[in-house]
Each structure stands twice: as C-alpha cells, then as structure tokens.
Amino acid sequence: MGKRKVSILEPAATAVAEIALFIESKGLPQTAKKFVDEAFEFFLKLSDERIEHKPCTYNQWKNLKYRCVSFKKKYVIAYLSQEREIVVCDFVSAKLLK
C-alpha cells in the first residue's frame, strides 16, 4: 500500500492555468492562486492506490480508457490509472461534456 507517481500532461496544466488567469482577470489574484494550489493538491491525492475512480462516460475518453473524477463539482479530471503511475490527461468544465 502506497503512493503512485503523478504525472500531469500539458493540456491539464494549461487548463488549470487558463481558469486561474480568468479568475485573476476578475480582480481575484488570491482566489486564482488558491484555485491552482487546490487543483494540484487534488492531482497529488489521486496517487493513493487504494482509490480507483469510475471509467469516464464521455465517449472519447472512454475509448482512451481514462478514469474520471469531479473537482469542486464544476470540473472533471480525466486520468490514466497505471500500476505505478497516475497520468493526469485533461481538466475541463463539466458543462462541456454534456
């Protein structure tokens, strides 16, 4: 029982940064920083090998064998779960997947 390595792909990191930039543009720089910190802390929590989330229902992600988890009820994180590594592949608004 332990932790797996967490790798974050560029599309996921870029999506978090774009959301933070939007929050900051609304005059909320501390909120933007907090959002980024919370998102990346959440990514690291995915490393717990005891936790396995459901496969994604979004067809393109389902075909890629991604697993999905909700973040703050507004976003979806898509990741690949491997024996020794979690690969965070995407981070999107849940509204875009409907």
PLM regions: where:
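Basic, Lys/Arg-enriched alpha-helical interface segments
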Residues: 1-65
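Enriched for short, Lys/Arg-rich terminal
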Residues: 26, 71-98
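Short solvent-exposed loop/turn micro-motifs enriched in small/polar/acidic residues
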Residues: 61-62, 70-72
